[in-house]
Amino acid sequence: MRKILHPLYVLYQVLFAWWVAILLIVLTSITILIFGHWFKIKNGDHIPGVIWCKLTCWLFLIPVKVVDRDKYMPRKGENVVFAANHQGMFDIFVMYGYIARRYKWIMKDSLRKVPFLGVACAATGHIFVNRTTPQKDLLRRALDTLQDSSLGVFPEGTRSRNGKLGTFKKGAFVMANMSQKTVVPISIQGSYDILPRGCWCVHWSPVVLTFHKPIECQGRGSENVEYLMEQTRAAIAATLGEE
């Protein structure tokens, strides 16, 4: 049935969805700049982004199921590190739209070049990184951000090339260790095939966003970094069936 409907889904994207998606990027970016950056209205840099991400999921008819968010979401006012596996481009919309908590992204510097969106993200405090970003500079910016907001990171550092969970890098857990912030593992299932690398055509797939038990720091230092990283990866891997 999905193969039969796919040509109609592609036609829907070409004639309608992508045009509306582009318009949403422009309108959301302008709204964030006006209310979040210039007038500094409370949550003016956050709520428009949440609405944009949810509308994008709805626009492309992508159903998102959220599991255990209320059970494992830290109390209000507690800043944490949200760490999720990275299956595909749609992870960004799913996470920002459905985490239901204000946070800042650590994102690739290439996103800064996206018209309107890059300017809005930079103006509202999201952290851009590339391979030449000094580790000390990244840590300083992340620690400063964690004073006022939570952080969202993909510990794999890039999208999965085969749909499987990749190796985690230590950066996010070094930040959690240095700030003594709790890590909230999040597993994303179903987004790998939605927008494959090098393809503009969205492929329909339901997505499940699962929250796991928060992992608190056990002391401070390299052992704590390894502990946070191992526990986070194990929680996500168990849900993905990759133990």
Language-model-detected regions and their locations in the chain:
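Catalytic core of membrane glycerolipid acyltransferases/transacylases, capturing the structured
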Residues: 28-50, 58-59, 74-133
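Short glycine/serine/threonine/alanine-rich loop segments
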Residues: 62, 126, 180-181
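N-terminal membrane-anchoring alpha-helices
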Residues: 1-65
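Short gly/ser/thr-rich secondary-structure transition/capping motifs
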Residues: 61-67, 133, 192-193
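Non-catalytic C-terminal accessory region of glycerolipid acyltransferases
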Residues: 4-7, 136-243
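Active-site phosphate/pyrophosphate- and oxyanion-stabilizing loops and adjacent acidic/basic residues
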Residues: 54, 93, 173-174
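Soluble, non-transmembrane catalytic domains of enzymes that act on hydrophobic metabolites at membranes
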Residues: 1-2, 66-69, 75, 234, ...
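Generic preference for hydrophobic
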Residues: 66, 82, 105-106, 126, ...
